């Protein structure tokens, strides 16, 4: 139960925000109370905001009732800055608007747009989003800016602080200010004179303290996000510029960022990389220091543009070992102690090829004094250097994937001044070893002196917590006392480094930060406990539990226990923002498993299981697209299938029905055809509008599958058999009076075989064996007919498996959780295809990519293809393509994406049309077998973006 102040707050906001965007239930409060870090707080209220006006109203009410507020975008933060035990306001989906200046050098963004999406928007203009954190494919602009997250290339010259031009913010009292709008500035100065004057006073006081001003400049000469950002006070005179830049790195402790205008960066078209290997870590660091100084002679260019080396990523020997780097493995065989081997992944970029070649020559000359294990070799071929970067990207999942059950994967984040790098790196390596973190590795942005070190840490005992506390105290001493570096370089202060802000910065700087906080948030209601925290042990409290979900080790779903809750999966989860995301499903199942195992709170367990059914189970498409962006390759759909299996145990009515369908599949399919015919008849009689209205009402009241105008007519493969027979062989004309069943069809195709023709085994999917075309379809023939015709035009003889109408890949049962039946059907199909292909002699074609994807997972001994891949691979040179001038929109299915065939279908479409359009921000369609009929709202949400584009 919420307290009286929360109750009053709730009563008021329900008049401002729809109920479906206000969460007070146990399930969703827990789900949204998780970010990528290793802390957990459960909010009292979660509100999904849609507009600046809503934020203003919410902050006014929170101010009135004295209730703390935390803002959250993607929840990929690592230091505990996006969690709350009070009010959590989410600003993600629906905060995705943007605009680009005519010269493409500026972009205005709302906080909910993903960083990679910004890059996609800017790519046609040769520009890019300046900050480049490793989470750019998942993190949203609001979080990137408010954490001053940087990355491999942007360093300190192109981070959010350096490219920010103006900001639109909502202050703690609900006031809206646009620092880039003259009218807004004038209004704010008139209504908030004390605020305006206090900014000026702080600016002047900091500048008057020459020692403090010099320290600020020195501290920000390297990456630093510890505490609030004080650099604006020494960079800018204009109070509004100072206000805007104070937002960068403020982690939601000062105001809400509703919009930001930033300078875009030039995206160099020519790039080259080299993986340099040194036999000791100090030499590797010395080489980085030398490369940092390299500049070209273009005096008209900016200092950053003149820098020849754009990136240098250091990977210590444990990093190389974790990804089984082949050079490391070779070196390990040659020496007794391979612990010195260190790689530096180096990148240079240029505007022209000539400039790129010159850059490479300069770097190679610079490296001559250094001894490398293998010769220096740069490559400008993407297919080659992408392998280097894949090694770099693979470190985190490789180390995280080896963690023991119940431990969490921590990524610490420090920075040193470049001149200290050789000694500091060796010291850090020794410090970690001294504390017994034998599996920890050091890697990161060496060119900026910024390292990450990964720890697989348990917090289950007091000794575990003490070990981590001792480590962090020693890290604090090393980084601050010995090298005057940054305890947090790009991951945010959060709760993790809040106790050490004053220690790193000193009294004067910390007092200045406190003065800024007091000015912006006098009641301390904005993200309390973050950056400023009076508890010296807040960094070792409120740890997130990671209990095991009991799953058979042989099951692919067992991978969910490797989940570190980073949230990278959510960009591909279609229900994220609708019900629950893939990450949230794992979070909730962990808590449900914990409650089951402990038996401590049966009422809460019952409540969570009940509340989970619709958002967690029924609206999970189960397609596994989430695995494509997961660093551990976790398919949360596998977990959903296990949950569904538990609800349909053997002997249950549902399981028996599924088993009956599997055993009588041909008959069940035949019985569906009259149903489709009846629906088509009703459509013809009633018309589309009346039919839609009636069936929608029946769906809402009775729960029957929803009819749509696109519902196809019934179809039977053998209705086309006679045309196939005539087209393939005169010998088949004698079969024109035979019964049209699939057994006959197989016999007919066998008659036509000859030893010289190319052959293919064609298995039409269950859907295409049963369903034809919808009413008023612009297409004349069903897919099976078209497919056979196309194969014959390409000179292929078509072979069908025996008893085709009884066969299925098993997807139907897998999606329902009847996994053993699904595997049984897959085995039946494999046997039939093995026979039809003459033991794998001929390729096998299936016309439905989801079916083909499952076939590839369960059938290993045959070459299996879906239509686009088969046509592009085998028929492209045998057919004459005539391009249409009509634009063609292509939807790339989940299964095609997972099989790596997205480019294939687009390339094939370009052979057929002069203009091919792939709608942006469309992943899974949400139909998911029959989910589009039973839960059409999921399908509707998934396809909310393509209609305006098309």
Q: Over which residues does each language-model region extend?
A:
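N-terminal flexible segment immediately upstream of the FAD-binding catalytic core
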Residues: 1-60, 64, 74-105, 134, ...
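N-terminal glycine-rich flavin-associated loop
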Residues: 13, 37-69, 87-133, 149-201, ...
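Conserved phosphate/anionic-ligand binding catalytic regions in large, soluble enzymes, centered on
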Residues: 75-78, 144-153, 240-265, 444-450, ...
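C-terminal substrate-binding/cap subdomain adjacent to the FAD-binding core in PCMH-type
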Residues: 144-146, 153-157, 164-393, 426, ...
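Flexible inter-domain linker/hinge segments
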Residues: 190-234, 511-572, 577-597, 693, ...
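Iron-sulfur cluster-binding electron-transfer modules in prokaryotic oxidoreductases
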Residues: 521, 551, 637-745, 751-950
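Non-heme iron-sulfur electron-transfer modules
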Residues: 532, 539-543, 576-612, 633-660
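Cysteine-centered iron-sulfur cluster-binding motifs in ferredoxin-type domains/subunits
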Residues: 556-577, 612-634, 894-895, 922-923
């Amino acid at each position: 139960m919420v307290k009286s102040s929360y109750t009053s707050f709730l009563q008021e906001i329900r008049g401002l925000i729809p109920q479906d965007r206000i969460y007070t239930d146990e399930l969703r409060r827990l789900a949204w109370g998780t970010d990528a870090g290793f802390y957990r707080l459960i909010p009292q209220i979660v509100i999904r905001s849609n507009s600046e006006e809503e934020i203003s109203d919410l902050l006014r009410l929170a101010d009135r009732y004295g209730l703390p507020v935390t803002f959250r975008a993607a929840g990929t933060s690592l230091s505990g800055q996006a969690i709350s035990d009070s009010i959590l306001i989410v600003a993600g989906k629906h905060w995705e608007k943007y605009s680009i200046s005519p010269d493409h050098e500026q972009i205005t963004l709302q906080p909910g747009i993903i960083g990679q999406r910004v890059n996609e928007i800017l790519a046609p203009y040769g520009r890019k989003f300046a900050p480049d954190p490793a989470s750019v494919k998942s993190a949203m602009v609001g979080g990137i800016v408010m954490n001053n997250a940087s990355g491999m290339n942007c360093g300190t010259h192109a981070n959010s602080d350096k490219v920010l031009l103006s900001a639109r913010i909502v202050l703690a009292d609900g006031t809206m200010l646009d620092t880039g709008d003259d009218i807004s500035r004038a209004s704010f100065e008139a209504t908030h004179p004390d605020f305006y004057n206090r900014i000026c006073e702080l600016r002047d006081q900091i500048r008057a303290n020459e020692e403090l001003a010099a320290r600020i400049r020195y501290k920000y000469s390297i990456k630093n996000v510890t505490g609030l950002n004080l650099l604006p006070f020494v960079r800018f005179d204009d109070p509004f510029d100072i206000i805007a830049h104070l937002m960068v790195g403020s982690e939601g402790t000062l105001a809400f960022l509703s919009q930001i205008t930033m300078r875009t960066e030039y995206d160099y078209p020519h790039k080259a990389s080299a993986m340099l290997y040194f036999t000791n870590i100090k030499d590797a660091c010395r080489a980085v220091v030398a490369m940092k100084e390299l500049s070209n002679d273009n005096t008209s260019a900016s200092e950053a543009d003149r820098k020849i080396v754009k990136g240098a990523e250091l990977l210590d020997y444990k990093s190389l070992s974790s990804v089984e780097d082949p050079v490391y493995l070779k070196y390990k065989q040659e020496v007794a102690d391979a612990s010195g081997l260190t790689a530096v992944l180096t990148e240079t970029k240029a505007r022209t090829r000539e400039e790129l070649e010159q850059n490479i020559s300069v770097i190679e000359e610079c490296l001559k004094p250094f001894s490398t294990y293998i010769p220096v070799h740069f490559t400008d071929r993407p297919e080659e250097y992408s392998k280097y970067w894949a090694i770099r990207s693979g470190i985190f999942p490789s180390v995280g994937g080896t963690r023991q059950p119940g431990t969490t994967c921590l990524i610490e984040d420090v920075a040193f001044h470049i001149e200290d790098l050789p000694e500091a790196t060796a010291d850090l390596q020794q410090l970690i070893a001294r504390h017994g973190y034998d599996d920890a590795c050091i890697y990161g942005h060496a060119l900026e002196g910024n390292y990450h070190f990964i720890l697989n840490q348990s917090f289950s005992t007091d000794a575990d917590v003490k070990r981590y506390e001792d480590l962090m105290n020693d890290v604090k001493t090393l980084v601050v006392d010995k090298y005057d570096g940054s305890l947090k370089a790009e991951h945010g202060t959060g709760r993790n480094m809040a106790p050490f802000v004053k220690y790193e910065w000193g009294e004067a700087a910390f007092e200045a930060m406190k003065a800024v906080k007091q000015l912006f948030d006098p009641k301390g209601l904005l993200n309390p406990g973050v950056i400023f925290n009076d508890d010296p042990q807040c960094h070792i409290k409120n740890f997130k539990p990671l209990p095991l979900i009991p799953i058979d080790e042989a099951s692919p779903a067992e991978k969910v226990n490797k989940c570190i809750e980073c949230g990278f999966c959510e960009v591909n989860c279609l229900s994220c923002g609708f019900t629950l995301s893939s990450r949230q499903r794992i979070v909730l199942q962990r808590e449900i498993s914990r409650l089951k195992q402990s038996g401590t709170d049966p009422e809460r367990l019952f409540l969570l299981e009940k509340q989970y059914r619709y958002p967690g189970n029924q609206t999970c498409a189960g397609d596994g697209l989430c695995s494509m962006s997961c660093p551990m390759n976790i398919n949360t759909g596998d977990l959903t299938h296990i949950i569904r299996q538990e609800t349909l145990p053997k002997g249950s009515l549902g399981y028996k029905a599924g088993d009956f369908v599997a055993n009588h599949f041909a008959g069940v399919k035949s019985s569906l055809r009259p149903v489709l015919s009846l629906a088509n008849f009703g459509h013809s009689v009633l018309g589309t509008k009346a039919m839609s209205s009636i069936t929608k009402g029946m769906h809402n009241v009775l729960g029957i599958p929803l009819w749509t105008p696109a519902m196809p007519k019934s179809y039977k493969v053998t209705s086309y058999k006679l045309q196939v027979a005539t087209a393939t062989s005169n010998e088949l004309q004698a079969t024109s009076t035979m019964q049209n069943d699939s057994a006959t069809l197989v016999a007919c195709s066998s008659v036509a075989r000859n030893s010289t023709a190319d052959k293919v085994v064609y298995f039409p999917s269950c859907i295409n064996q049963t369903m034809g075309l919808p009413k008023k379809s612009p297409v004349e023939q069903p897919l099976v007919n078209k497919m056979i015709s196309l194969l014959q035009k390409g000179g292929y003889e078509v072979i069908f498996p025996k008893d085709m109408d009884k066969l299925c890949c098993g997807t139907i049962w897998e999606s329902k959780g009847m996994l053993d039946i699904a595997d049984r059907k897959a085995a039946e199909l494999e046997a039939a295809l093995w026979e039809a292909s003459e033991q794998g002699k001929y390729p096998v074609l299936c016309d439905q990519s989801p079916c083909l994807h499952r076939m590839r997972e369960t059938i290993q001994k045959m070459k299996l293809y879906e239509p686009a891949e088969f046509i592009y691979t085998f028929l492209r040179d045998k057919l004459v393509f005539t391009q249409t001038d009509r634009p063609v929109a292509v939807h790339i299915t989940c299964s095609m994406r997972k099989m790596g065939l997205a480019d294939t279908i687009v390339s094939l479409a370009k052979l057929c049309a002069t203009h091919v359009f792939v709608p942006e921000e469309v992943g899974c369609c949400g139909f998911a077998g029959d989910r589009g009929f039973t839960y059409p709202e999921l399908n509707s949400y998934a396809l909310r973006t393509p209609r305006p584009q098309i």
